[in-house]
Amino acid sequence: MFKLLVLSCLLALALPSLAEVGWWKTGQFYQIYPRSFKDSDGDGVGDLIGITQQLPYLKEIGITATWLSPIFTSPMADFGYDVADLKGIDPIFGTMEDFEALLARAKELDIKIILDFVPNHTSDECDWFIRSAAGEEEYKDFYVWHTGKVVNGIRQPPTNWVSVFRGSMWTWNEQRQAYYLHQFHAKQPDLNYRNPKVVEAMKDVLRFWLRKGAYGFRIDAVPHVYEIPADADGNWPDEPRNEAVSDPEDYTYLQHIYTTDQPETLELVYAFRDVIEEIDAELGGDDRVLLTEAYSPLEVLMQYYGNGTHLGSQIPFNFELLAKISYSSDAYHYSELIHNWLDNMPEGQVANWVFGNHDQSRIGSRLGADRIDACNMIILGLPGVSVTYQGEEMGMTDVWISWEDTVDPQACQSNEQEFERLTRDPVRTPFQWSDEVNAGFSNASVTWLPVASNYKLVNVKKERGIALSHLNVYKQLRALRDEPTLKQGDVSVTAIGPNVLAFKRSLAGYKSYITLININDDVESINLDSVFTSITTQLQYVVVNDKSVRRKNDLTFANSVLLLPKEAVVLSTV
């Protein structure tokens, strides 16, 4: 006997005809964190030549495009997100010639290269900032400056605004005799997008890399780009308190109503998309794309797609699953979050699915190692774009790093009691290629972050040889995405009670595919005839994980599918 509770709302999402589907609309995107992917020169830090050497691996796992975290010239205060030369390659990663060789090899393998673009700020070592601090007329207003306010004879920052990296958003510059704004690190001064020259300068940076051969950009930290306009006297209001937080240095101490998600932000995204369209017209070939990072309310995110008049980001990252799913989430929660995106997405747009990135705890650590395959089934089985962070395909997990060895500035600016809550180092450790020294990442005596202690058990070489390893399950799921049903079929998503997430992909004239995920530790018996319509009496197992006693091509009756604890499978009609 079993309970069958079906979420009432099933979604039938009509997708465009196959002829209308561009390369990215059903693409597999893969994030590379260059410092940690592959070290070719033995300095303990990954580089462009290392990435080029390993591009065949991306081809092996079916990747369509890879976006690289920043590779530009930087003093590395925030590991490349503090850019000093927006048109240069940092020597730690290689040379412009190395980048061009990477582009050429990627083209041979039909893999698109996407670059990380950081619009909110530059490094304080950027020539623009140096000139702005010196008061040069051309660059005087490239950044956000204010002389502050004097209280009881003491000069203070102009507002109470708190940085993402703790402490005041304002730092005093002796040369300029003024405070400059930095929403992040003090070495990351914010650009002033209310100056049209800044907008044009950044659009020119986009053009430069697109003409080099990049196929688009992942745009970093978009909600922070604009602050509320200053009043007639050039001043801004303080932000209100968040009464739930007592630490005045912590970013969450304030409600950031004046420093995030300002309406002009969307207009800037649309302007960046205009550049994409301009270069598409100039160079031709496959479409170039924008991916935007914003942990913003859903109603704001949907506007990133465009407003009916202007085109926006083709791929505004969907962080519903990444940010809101927890270890204790039930199937209803998974289904609700999937529906949140699909039900609110503007007509004609493309969904995307993300479970990991370089800022968030890895799937296996956050949700449990026995849910890794399930999460990959979700991102690779639902319609639209899948996004995988390096190592998630083989089940890499977070690495504990001591306070003494922590290098992430977000954590280093805290203290020994707080750093573990803030550090991103555990998800950025070297990629695990093999059971050789340093997991095959580097032959250096010391790597920039320590290698995971489990690398001899979890690595590409070992998992290639295990039939139901995370890597091989991922590759099977990826191969299945080439089926017409998964490229252009409808989708229905539901929870079958609290433990089982189910979704069906269907297309007239082709097999239907049903994904079943047992999130918890109960044995479940499912009558799919009462869940989905138009399925055959018997179903065939197409993909199984290592919790299953079934094997590929086994048959089962639709009215009595047995799911073991944490089992995740894909079935097809026969």
Swiss-Prot record:
Residues 1-19 form the signal peptide. This is Maltase A3. It catalyses: Hydrolysis of terminal, non-reducing (1->4)-linked alpha-D-glucose residues with release of alpha-D-glucose. Glycans are attached at residues 120, 307, 443. Keywords: Glycoprotein, Glycosidase, Hydrolase, Signal. One of its GO terms (biological process) is carbohydrate metabolic process. The active site is at residues 220, 293. CDD domains: AmyAc_maltase. It comes from Drosophila melanogaster. InterPro entries: Glyco_hydro_13_cat_dom, Glycoside_hydrolase_SF, O16G_dom_2. It comes from the Eukaryota. The record marks 359 as: Transition state stabilizer. One of its GO terms (molecular function) is alpha-1,4-glucosidase activity. SUPFAM superfamilies: (Trans)glycosidases (SSF51445). Gene3D superfamilies: Glycosidases, Oligo-1,6-glucosidase, Domain 2. Belongs to the glycosyl hydrolase 13 family. Its EC number is 3.2.1.20.
